[in-house]
């Protein structure tokens, strides 16, 4: 069972927040919202579609991006081997860009594709627990 106001998909709970925060602040915020909470980790195309729908319905007219729980470690295009909640990255769906370090969902792709964004940018986000 998900906390009130959260949506369920395959045993996990999700909640989009229309609060503009940096990646680090958003991740910290998610850990405070629910037991086991983190920025969303997208591990299948089905989950990607579910999250895209959730964002589209709940975070209207965001400028462009929505944080997910993935950041690039180091200067190379070396993706972190795990999501912020510790789960490993097996599903990937991002747009190549110059090295920026944190990943967000891009509005132009219906919040389905991932794009590298500067981690200090303030964006809405989705928490998962």
UniProtKB/Swiss-Prot annotation:
One of its GO terms (molecular function) is toxin activity. It is found in: Secreted. InterPro entries: C-type_lectin-like, C-type_lectin-like/link_sf, C-type_lectin/snaclec_domain, C-type_lectin_CS, CTDL_fold. The keyword Transmembrane does not apply. GO terms for cellular component: extracellular region. Ca(2+) binds at residues 41, 43, 47, 128. It comes from the Eukaryota. Expressed by the venom gland. Keywords: Blood coagulation cascade inhibiting toxin, Calcium, Disulfide bond, Hemostasis impairing toxin, Metal-binding, Secreted, Toxin. Residues 1-129 form the C-type lectin domain. Heterodimer of subunits A and B; disulfide-linked. Anticoagulant protein which binds to the gamma-carboxyglutamic acid-domain regions of factor IX (F9) (but not factor X) in the presence of calcium with a 1 to 1 stoichiometry. Belongs to the snaclec family. PANTHER family: MANNOSE, PHOSPHOLIPASE, LECTIN RECEPTOR RELATED. This is Snaclec coagulation factor IX-binding protein subunit A. It comes from Protobothrops flavoviridis (Habu). The lineage of its organism: Eukaryota, Metazoa, Chordata, Craniata, Vertebrata.
């Amino acid at each position: 069972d998900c906390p009130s106001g959260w949506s369920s998909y395959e045993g996990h709970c999700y909640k989009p927040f229309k609060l503009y925060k940096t990646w680090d602040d958003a991740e910290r915020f998610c850990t405070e919202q629910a037991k086991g909470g983190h920025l969303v980790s997208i591990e299948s195309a089905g989950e990607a579609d579910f999250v895209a729908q959730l964002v589209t319905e709940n975070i209207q007219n965001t400028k462009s991006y929505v944080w997910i729980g993935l950041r690039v470690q180091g200067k190379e295009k070396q993706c972190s081997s795990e999501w912020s909640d510790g789960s490993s990255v097996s599903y990937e769906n991002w747009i190549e860009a110059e090295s920026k370090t944190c990943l967000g969902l891009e509005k132009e792709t219906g919040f389905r594709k991932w794009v590298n964004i500067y981690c200090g940018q303030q964006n809405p986000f989705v928490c998962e627990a």
